[in-house]
Amino acid sequence: MAHNDTIDIISSSPEFPDISVLVAKAASKKSALRTGSNATPIPSDAVGLGTFTSAASIWHLSQVMDEEKPTKNSSSRPAKETPAIATSVSTVAVEVSATTTTAVSEEKPGKKPRKPRKKKDETTAAVDENAPPKPPARRGRPPKQKDVEGQPALPKSKATKPAAKPRASRKKAETVSKHFAASAHASTADPPEEPSKNPAASKPPKPIPVQNIDEPVDLEPAARRRLDWTPPPDDRPPPAAGNSSVVKELPSSTTAHTEPPVAFGKLLDTYGCEPETIQPSEGTKGNVLGKRKLIEMVATTTTTNTATDKLTSPETSPTKPKAPKKKPRTITDLATAAYRIQDPVDDSISTVAPKQDTLLGYIDVEDEDAAVKPGGAKTKAVSKKPAKARVSKKKPEPRKQLLLSPHSALRQVSGQNFVFGTSSQLVTEDTDLLRALHESMKTAGNAQESDPFMSSPVKFSNIASRSKMGNNKLWRVGARDEDGDLLDLEIFDLTEAVEVPEDVVQQADKPAVDVPEREASPRKQVEREAERAIGIFSSDPVATERLTITGPETLISTLSIKGKESVRRTTKSPPPNPVAPPRERTPQRARPPSRDSLSSRLRSPQTETSPRPTTPPRVSAVLDLDYDFDDYEPPPSNQEHYQLLEQSQKTSPSKTQQRKQQQQQQQQQQQQQKKRDPPPRPKYEVFTDAQLSREIASYGFKPIKKRAAMIRLLEQCWESKTGAATGKSTGLGDNTLQEGTGSLEPAHRSINSVAVSPDRGRGQTIQGAHMQEARAGIKMAASATKRPRKKAAVASASAPRTSTMENPPKAATAASTSTTTAPLPALSASTSKRQRRTSLSSIRPRPPILEIPDSDIDISDSDPFASSPPVSSPDASPPASQLFSTPEKHHQDHKHDLAAEMSLITDCEESLLDMTSRTPSEADLFKHITEAITTAPRTTNPSEPSWHEKILMYDPIILEELTAWLNTAGKGLDRVGWEGCEAGTEEVRRWCESKGVGWVWREGNRGQVRKRF
């Protein structure tokens, strides 16, 4: 019966190929998933290798897992073995048959007792022999039971969907833990991790020789890496080189060794616990990097590399540069180092200070090194640079900061060396020059207080250094005279001078026989001579224009760089200037001056009579340099030069001052003479508009726009002021005019008989009957000359006149404005029309071109009527004929031009002239008009403002409307109590002009403005 049982087992064996076929089909679909990006490439020479590992490694892992864990459940193991076997690239038939028999042997113990296990070897052999004929022999039910048992592997490979139905219906599927099922789905790369752990399953791979070859290659390196690279996420954050190697080896068989023990636990470790593993990795990695850097730094600085130095030096290194004492290396530090107050330095600190100056000193720490390192190492570091510390101790202590007095501060500044400023411009390759300049500055500071700019002579041993001072452009260009004008000195090139024989130089060195030696202060005498020359040049306007200096022959002698070359230029002086008086000169010879500045070397040497040159020479001066270099000092600055000029002015006044004094004396004499004689009439046509308006305001009149009206009014006022004193001069002009006209006596008598009180102030009213007569005369002249003046404006284009010249208007105008000595041409009735036209056309060819006066000219300080203005004074140069570019005849007959220009006066100016003839009744009327307008009630309608509001808003006042309002009962003049006659438009117009109110006439029918009534 037992034999029959075995036969039954054999009869059921043909069903096993069906299982392998199903597994093979599932594996064929599964291979597409395993050959993705995560699958490792399989070499072409590999034999028996799957997608992840070889068959030998699978059997070896099964043995290892059997040792670590007992067999828990054999039902799920064949499901994990079959995919790995099916997915192999080159599957050997022997290996497949072996695995299938093991799967069958593992499934049978679940149904039958374990007794028939002893015959497994026989069954496997039978199955291997009958492997090809198994597929055709199939039966219904027995294979279904075995398919159900092997079904749990199908969901893992995701091969077929209908396999899920028997999985839920069978009770055997529940024996598989959910954790294992999840691990089977999650990690597809771990099918060979848990093979069958039965001892029978581990027996077949032993005869395979490939297992012994792969064991030392795959297993041993994996164990070493697990020890060295203990959590894998440690090396992930930084891009280290080691991480790339780890990533490359993850899909290898070594990863299978680290993760397989617990599939579900490994999933949580690799994905859920990454943040916990990163924190310890940062600490360990920082320590490693810190140690490496510390080892490199300590190796360069010290000889002893101890563990304590490695730990302490990185912590204390940032606190080390707190007290480094460096030397000042910038320009500001160098300039302020001498004035900085330094703290006292101890000896202990000074010994360590040299260490901080070098780069090695920044690595070691003073306090911790002294505590950790032995004493011998410390003394060696200090003994390396002992000399540097001693040099720093020998530096002089800085002076205490004190508030010095001005004298002591100047003395201290004079003792300092110039690092910047003008002295740096003089620095050349020759250092003797700068050294000599400093010495001269120091000696100048110790001079006497009476003459602070006097300094002791400085000896120059080197001629080259002396010659460098000859090109001081700043002082020469900036030299100015007492009036503030620049000196136009001639520039000489000392480098390209002509060589002079020795005998000439020796002869020049000899002192002059006829010139006495200079006494106590030779410098002042030289300065006086220089100031005299400067005064000649600056005070003479003609000499300034011609750029010449009147005087004797000037000899210019200069030395070159070598001291043997010189330039001598001789210029013949012209005869004495006709404008400026000749100046006495002391016969002198060119003698080298001692201790004189560059700006004060203008001298007048030997005098000789010579003919006048054809061309005016340039301004020349003698620039005599010291031949023996015994006495020399640097040229003074502009400030010093100005002080020297002030001192020279105190001792010897210049020609300009003498000339000013003479002018003052002449003015005093003229004033005294004017008191006795009548003053000459001022030339108002020469005055500017501003001067004319100022003179008119001094008489109390309002400003006038037209220039001719201002001149006419001033002349009338001047005639009324002088009174009878001017009767003679005006009488001459009247007689000449009366010969032709004979009808101007009433007007001129009324004008000339007026006298004004001389002591009245500005703005005071003219009192007395004389002023009334003057007003009447002015009004007569203005009213009588309205029409003729209007016609005279176009006299050249108008029709020829008849005997209208006998009328008084033109003659009265000419007579009132004629005060010059030249007589007017007699225009009698017998004069022909052509002669009159030519005389008038010659009178007004063009108006005079007046020069715009300078702001310095101010005539208000002196009496404008006492004398003529400075530009028109007879003793001034040039005369008025040269000042104004007009013909001489025009200036002689300027009153004719003035008469012609008066014809351009408009009605506005005439009305201003009529203001002077205001009667008391008109003044009272104007007062009531002002009161009526200002006291009128304010309007409540913004569109109709009152007259006062219109005036305040600068609205033009219509004369007809204002006159009608003033004459309205109960509104204008009637409201303020005016009892006189009604106001007319002409009176209202004059009131507006007196108050400066803008007025207009109402337009006529043709759209034109009516000017007169």
Curated annotation (Swiss-Prot):
Keyword DNA damage attached: yes
Compartmental location: Nucleus
Annotated Basic residues bias: 381-393
Biological-process GO terms, alphabetical: DNA recombination; DNA repair; DNA replication
Keyword DNA repair: yes
Signal peptide: none
Record-linked Pfam families: Slx4
Post-translational modification: Phosphorylated in response to DNA damage.
UniProt keyword terms in alphabetical order: DNA damage, DNA recombination, DNA repair, Nucleus, Phosphoprotein
Location (main, coarse): nucleus
Transmembrane intervals: none
Matches recorded under InterPro entries: Slx4_ascomycetes, Structure-sp_endonuc_su_Slx4
Compositionally biased tracts (Basic and acidic residues): 221-237, 511-532, 674-686
Region (Disordered): 63-263, 300-329, 374-401, 502-541, 555-686, 755-895
One GO cellular component term noted in the UniProt record for this chain: Slx1-Slx4 complex
Composition skew (Polar residues), residue ranges: 242-257
Single GO term (MF): 5'-flap endonuclease activity
Compositional bias segments (type: Low complexity): 86-104, 152-166, 300-320, 589-620, 647-672, 811-832, 862-881
Quaternary structure note: Forms a heterodimer with slx1.
Family to which this protein belongs: Belongs to the SLX4 family.
Protein role: Regulatory subunit of the slx1-slx4 structure-specific endonuclease that resolves DNA secondary structures generated during DNA repair and recombination. Has endonuclease activity towards branched DNA substrates, introducing single-strand cuts in duplex DNA close to junctions with ss-DNA.
HAMAP family assigned: Endonuc_su_Slx4
Protein name from the UniProt record: Structure-specific endonuclease subunit slx4
Species of the source: Neurospora crassa (strain ATCC 24698 / 74-OR23-1A / CBS 708.71 / DSM 1257 / FGSC 987)
Gene assigned in the entry: slx4
